[in-house]
Amino acid sequence: MAHKKGVGSSRNGRDSNPKMRGVKRFGGELVRAGNIIVRQCGTKIKPGANVGVGRDWTLYALVDGVVQFSHYSRTQKKVSVIPVAAETTAN
C-alpha cells in the first residue's frame, strides 16, 4: 500500500483551434473572383466550372458570377460559378 496518494496530472487539457470550415457563399449568391465559396477538409464538394481549389481544398471563385450547387453523382456535390454581366456585379 502506498503511504502517500499519487499526485497525477490530468492527461486532458488539450484542444485545437477552430478551423471555421463550411459553406461561405450559398447558391444564388453573387461572388467576385477570388471569393471563398467553401472551406472544407478533403473534397467533400467537388469544383465545377469557374471554381478553383486551394492547397487546403478550399473552393474559390475564378470569375465574377453567381454560385450554383449541383450533384456531381448520386452521393457527391459540385459547385460552379455562372458568369454574369459586368453591370450586375458592379452594383
From Swiss-Prot:
GO BP terms, alphabetized: translation
Source lineage: Bacteria, Bacillati, Chloroflexota, Chloroflexia, Chloroflexales
Region of interest (Disordered), residue spans: 1-24
Gene designation: rpmA
Protein name listed in UniProt: Large ribosomal subunit protein bL27
CC terms in the record's Gene Ontology section: cytosolic large ribosomal subunit
Family listed: Belongs to the bacterial ribosomal protein bL27 family.
UniProt-listed SUPFAM superfamilies: Ribosomal L27 protein-like
UniProt keyword annotations, A-Z: Ribonucleoprotein, Ribosomal protein
Matching Pfam families: Ribosomal_L27
Molecular-function annotations in GO: structural constituent of ribosome
Species name: Chloroflexus aggregans (strain MD-66 / DSM 9485)
